[in-house]
């Protein structure tokens, strides 16, 4: 017997029992995006490797250790996308939709990072991202956060996520802060672990994000980034806080929040939860006003966020188990006897025309009525439609409510209205 081929570690299959909930959650997210006037953009999974090195930063963990990179047959270096923002910016520049224009875009799909698989973190994972171009005020930052808060209310998880905010200022402000932080870290080199020593000169702000508890205590005495903010960034951040407060969105200022990608400036934010064990990020984003120019376009303000769908699904399942997708089908069409198969197919198509949202499954593969009713139960059908030779000859259908066993024989023309009533 041939050896079974398994899925790659950290790259998961999602079976129909799971995808129904995914679809309901995704549809809820998309409905809100549409209501705010955001439009979908579809992007390639594979991009040229230099795109991510320039956008994300050469000395980030993502570029140094986590990207799936390979050479194609022409010798070009390609990478499976580890995140969506860089590709979205590349597409906007390439197709000329950013310069002197306002764009509100969203995308959803798989991303790839070579990480150690664990609960809610996988090597192939799914993100929904949202990007806004051409608006530089704190009001659009606030709208993005308000939109995410609306999602949490719809999904029933609002009490289980908390908003953390910070401003990392302008490039000049960060350069001044970087000097002060490096000077502080140099005074305490003997207390730093190997990872922080490596980051101290290449990407010192990432030291603030360390998970080492001893270094976290040390950092309590480190310089604070907010003390180095330029006046414009400070005013931007203060106005954002006022807008959120007036909108009833509570938040905490986290001075260590810097995000793991180099392209951010000014506003950064994360929605975090402790309901999945250790604190985890559900949604994160911020401003990246320099990226469009950095990738070859005209200077364009930009802000956005990304949300990991695996972690979101886990959170909904954990804290709001009543948020379920409809399982099974609405109706199961049973037929037996000479001439009933084509009659069943024709009836099914008419019902789908009349009720476009109807989930109707037709029995194929034969079987007596008992076996077909068993299949209807297996698929979770709420109603059975029965066609025998007598019903076909009379132009009728038996409609049986499978929850209480009640049934009626109706003319075929009346079946759609009865189904609509039963399934309402």
Swiss-Prot record:
Aminoacyl-tRNA synthetase recorded as keyword: yes
BP GO terms, sorted: histidyl-tRNA aminoacylation
E.C. number(s) listed in UniProt: 6.1.1.21
Keywords tagged on the record: Aminoacyl-tRNA synthetase, ATP-binding, Cytoplasm, Ligase, Nucleotide-binding, Protein biosynthesis
InterPro entries in UniProt: aa-tRNA-synth_II (IPR006195), aa-tRNA-synth_II/BPL/LPL (IPR045864), Anticodon-bd (IPR004154), Anticodon-bd_dom_sf (IPR036621), His-tRNA-ligase (IPR015807), HisRS-like_core (IPR041715), HisRS/HisZ (IPR004516), HisRS_anticodon (IPR033656)
Subcellular location: Cytoplasm
Example of a GO MF term: histidine-tRNA ligase activity
GO CC annotation: cytoplasm
Main location: cytoplasm
SUPFAM superfamilies named in the record: Class II aaRS ABD-related, Class II aaRS and biotin synthetases
Enzyme class: ligase
Reaction catalysed by this enzyme: tRNA(His) + L-histidine + ATP = L-histidyl-tRNA(His) + AMP + diphosphate + H(+)
Aminoacyl-tRNA synthetase is among the record's keywords: yes
Pfam families named among the record's database cross-references: HGTP_anticodon (PF03129), tRNA-synt_His (PF13393)
The protein's assembly and partners: Homodimer.
Sequence similarity: Belongs to the class-II aminoacyl-tRNA synthetase family.
Protein name as catalogued: Histidine--tRNA ligase
Gene: hisS
